[in-house]
């Protein structure tokens, strides 16, 4: 027999981020007690698919007319709690969790840059990022000029009217070159 618990309306935000401090938000933001079991901790949902009430409900979800989960590669309840918690901790309106840093970088670039966009990047970056800039992004019409991260003026010279992103890593991979971030930021602005 399942225990009785307090009613918690579907979709209710149990923690108002404005009322709590960082530690409390880190533990509880974005979640609510399980309405069936009363469990406090967020479970790890290992499902890939979800049940729909009817075809109208499914259509509304797929047409983005209603919030909800349709397939775990896109969203799931466990990841939704993580996203809501990060947004609360950062004071943001939302967050997007990705499967890797590479996925996050790709998502940010293709979301913010259009075809014909240009990137000026340090030549000393993670190999996966270099491959994305050199091989993948050109297929989207996005080009990259690689420059020496130790030379801020190289960044300035490489900027064109189509430049939309200046990219680098504070400690470049693999040589651990240190960028002059204040100067490069000044150039980028």
Task: Specify the residue positions occupied by each region the protein language model found.
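N-terminal "arm"/small-domain region of PLP-dependent enzymes with the aminotransferase-like
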Residues: 8-11, 15-76, 84
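Buried hydrophobic positions in well-ordered alpha/beta secondary-structure cores of metabolic enzymes
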Residues: 38, 86, 104, 119, ...
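Conserved N-terminal alpha-helix of the aminotransferase class I/II PLP-enzyme fold
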Residues: 54-106, 128-135
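Short helix-loop-beta connector
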Residues: 90-93, 113-116, 161
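Conserved PLP-anchoring active-site segment centered on the Schiff-base-forming lysine
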Residues: 111-129, 147-148
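A glycine-rich helix N-cap at a beta->alpha junction
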Residues: 135-136, 140-150
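Active-site phosphate-binding strand-loop segment of PLP-dependent enzymes
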Residues: 149-189
């Amino acid at each position: 027999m399942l225990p009785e618990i307090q009613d918690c309306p579907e979709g209710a935000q149990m923690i108002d981020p404005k009322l709590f401090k960082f530690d409390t938000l880190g533990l509880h933001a974005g979640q609510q007690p399980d309405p069936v079991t009363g469990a406090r901790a967020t479970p790890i949902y290992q499902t890939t698919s979800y049940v729909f009430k009817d075809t109208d409900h499914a259509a509304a979800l797929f047409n983005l007319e209603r919030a909800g989960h349709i397939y775990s590669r896109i969203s799931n309840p466990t990841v939704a709690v993580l996203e809501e918690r990060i947004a609360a901790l950062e004071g943001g309106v939302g967050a997007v969790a990705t499967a890797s840093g590479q996925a996050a970088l790709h998502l940010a670039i293709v979301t913010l840059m259009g075809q014909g966009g240009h990137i000026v990047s340090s030549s000393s970056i993670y190999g996966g990022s270099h491959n994305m800039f050199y091989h993948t992004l050109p297929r989207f019409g996005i080009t990259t000029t690689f420059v020496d991260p130790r030379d801020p003026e190289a960044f300035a010279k490489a900027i064109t009217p189509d430049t939309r992103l200046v990219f680098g890593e504070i400690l470049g991979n693999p040589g651990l070159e240190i960028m002059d971030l204040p100067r490069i930021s000044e150039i980028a602005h």
